[in-house]
Amino acid sequence: MIGKLSGTLDDKNPPQVIVDCHGVGYEVLVPMSTFYNLPELGARVSLLTHFVVREDAQILYGFATSQERAAFRELIKISGVGPRTALSVLSGMSVAELAQAVTLQEGGRLIKVPGIGKKTAERLLLELKGKLGPDIGVAASVANDSQADILQALLALGYSDKEAAAALKALPSDVGVSEGIRLALRALGK
């Protein structure tokens, strides 16, 4: 398996790039988030990759971050979601946005991605719940350290990710930890 490519960026044509590694040019399909962050042609580039072998093709998918690659791998494990659809999802939203959509069970955000219908969005929400990593989900909904502490407190008290994130969203951004927990508990108690 090819896990990483480092070389010279020879060509950029969305969603495909060609990376020259010591005279061998590798075609790599990348999500748009990675594509927009690529350097100029002729510059050195390093991509984490996922290698897919099919009966009729061998395809490399490249990612700028390990979180993107991990999300891609989780997406392709889902029945009915292939590498192209997974690439489309990661092109349509960042990993943090995907994690937040899954945490808050917002299928409407997923439906906006080309190639994702209502049933596929529901399947993604169900299958990805808890699989994108707690650090990604927390980072998506937390603006500062006090909000992170409030979120952790609510989760420790047994509230679901969705309930805790919704309560956190309703709080003022400059609220302190103890006051934030009190306000969140009051909101959740209604």
Curated annotation (Swiss-Prot):
Its main location: cytoplasm. Residues 137-141 are annotated as: Flexible linker. SMART domains: HhH1 (SM00278). The keyword DNA damage applies. Belongs to the RuvA family. InterPro entries: DNA_helicase_Holl-junc_RuvA_I, Hlx-hairpin-Hlx_DNA-bd_motif, NA-bd_OB-fold, RuvA, RuvA_2-like, RuvA_C, RuvA_C_sf. Residues 142-190 are annotated as: Domain III. Keywords: Cytoplasm, DNA damage, DNA recombination, DNA repair, DNA-binding. Homotetramer. Forms an RuvA(8)-RuvB(12)-Holliday junction (HJ) complex. HJ DNA is sandwiched between 2 RuvA tetramers; dsDNA enters through RuvA and exits via RuvB. An RuvB hexamer assembles on each DNA strand where it exits the tetramer. Each RuvB hexamer is contacted by two RuvA subunits (via domain III) on 2 adjacent RuvB subunits; this complex drives branch migration. In the full resolvosome a probable DNA-RuvA(4)-RuvB(12)-RuvC(2) complex forms which resolves the HJ. GO terms for cellular component: cytoplasm; Holliday junction helicase complex; Holliday junction resolvase complex. It comes from Albidiferax ferrireducens (strain ATCC BAA-621 / DSM 15236 / T118) (Rhodoferax ferrireducens). The RuvA-RuvB-RuvC complex processes Holliday junction (HJ) DNA during genetic recombination and DNA repair, while the RuvA-RuvB complex plays an important role in the rescue of blocked DNA replication forks via replication fork reversal (RFR). RuvA specifically binds to HJ cruciform DNA, conferring on it an open structure. The RuvB hexamer acts as an ATP-dependent pump, pulling dsDNA into and through the RuvAB complex. HJ branch migration allows RuvC to scan DNA until it finds its consensus sequence, where it cleaves and resolves the cruciform DNA. It is found in: Cytoplasm. SUPFAM superfamilies: DNA helicase RuvA subunit, C-terminal domain, Nucleic acid-binding proteins, RuvA domain 2-like. Residues 65-137 are annotated as: Domain II. Residues 1-64 are annotated as: Domain I. The lineage of its organism: Bacteria, Pseudomonadati, Pseudomonadota, Betaproteobacteria, Burkholderiales. This is Holliday junction branch migration complex subunit RuvA. Has three domains with a flexible linker between the domains II and III and assumes an 'L' shape. Domain III is highly mobile and contacts RuvB. One of its GO terms (molecular function) is four-way junction DNA binding. GO terms for biological process: DNA recombination; DNA repair.
